[in-house]
Regions:
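Short loop/turn segments that flank or connect secondary-structure elements
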Residues: 1-272
Length: 272
């Protein structure tokens, strides 16, 4: 596949080629000129995730099926969506750039989601997400789904930041009827497996080699408050160094047969 995913802003053009399993990308990307941080790779990861999803859609069609995800189908927008730390900063900056009154409306929806979590007695458990084991990720994902809290970016059952939605949202594809996603029926949901996860590419940044967890992630519903309370103190490096590390992360994926609702993001643990 050929294409030209472009991170926002001007930079140095670079030819990029990625091959992982059945996915092959060859195109031109634009890297920042000055030293930068992993969060600056988010636009590139979003574009690459789109390319991988399109490739998967063609593969599914060739097999006589079709991806059933479409506008207005928002069942997965009530899942516990995982975003990388880089994406949490990206979403925070995105909301801060929104004009009023829209910025206030989005922030109020985040506040309402937080109130509902607190009323349900689930907020404290959710705030402990960095310590969760793989089993807890699944169990608490189920508990979160039962609350049916819509994503704060959801408006009229459609994503209001569709062009900037998280990588995990782009990588969650199914061929089964929407009602199975609504009930989070793992036995009935037919997920589309992807040969590469760009969520992992972002979420591996900052993970020590000896760490138990494979990824650093944040619940989307807590992304804004997390970004506010965790200033990005990552040391700036050359964009080419960051890109090389990002590409290396893509080879660290632990493939699964299908997505694992209702926790969307692909986080696993070494010793769950």
């Amino acid at each position: 596949m050929q294409g030209s995913p472009q991170p926002s802003g001007e930079g140095i053009p670079l030819r990029l080629e990625i091959t992982r399993g059945s996915f092959h990308f060859r195109g031109t990307v634009s890297l920042p000129v000055l030293p930068t941080r992993p969060r600056e790779l988010v636009p590139l990861a979003l574009a690459l995730a789109d390319a991988a999803a399109e490739d998967a859609g063609r593969r599914v069609a060739a097999e006589g099926s079709a991806v059933s995800c479409k506008k207005g189908c928002a069942a997965c927008c009530r899942y516990l969506v995982h975003v990388s730390e880089s994406e949490a900063y990206y979403l925070y900056e995105l909301v801060e750039r929104l004009p009023e009154p829209r910025r206030g409306q989005v922030r109020e929806r985040f506040a309402e989601a937080r109130r509902r979590l607190q009323q349900a007695g689930f907020l404290e458990a959710l705030q402990q997400f960095p310590t969760w084991t793989g089993r807890e990720i699944h169990e608490r994902g189920q508990a979160y789904h039962a609350l049916q809290i819509p994503c704060p970016f959801l408006e009229d059952e459609s994503c209001s930041i569709y062009a900037d939605r998280p990588v995990a949202c782009r990588e969650y594809l199914v061929t089964s009827p929407p009602q199975y996603c609504a009930t989070a029926d793992r036995m009935a949901i037919r997920g589309v497996s992807l040969p590469v996860s760009f969520f992992v590419g972002l979420a591996r940044f900052g993970v020590p080699a000896e760490a138990k967890t494979l990824h650093r992630w944040v619940p989307l519903v807590l992304a804004l408050e997390w970004a506010e309370s965790h200033p990005d103190r990552t040391a700036a490096r050359s964009a080419s160094q960051l890109l090389n590390e990002f590409i290396e992360h893509l080879g660290m994926r632990f493939p699964t047969e299908k997505p694992s609702p209702p926790a969307t993001g692909g986080c696993e643990e070494r010793n769950a």
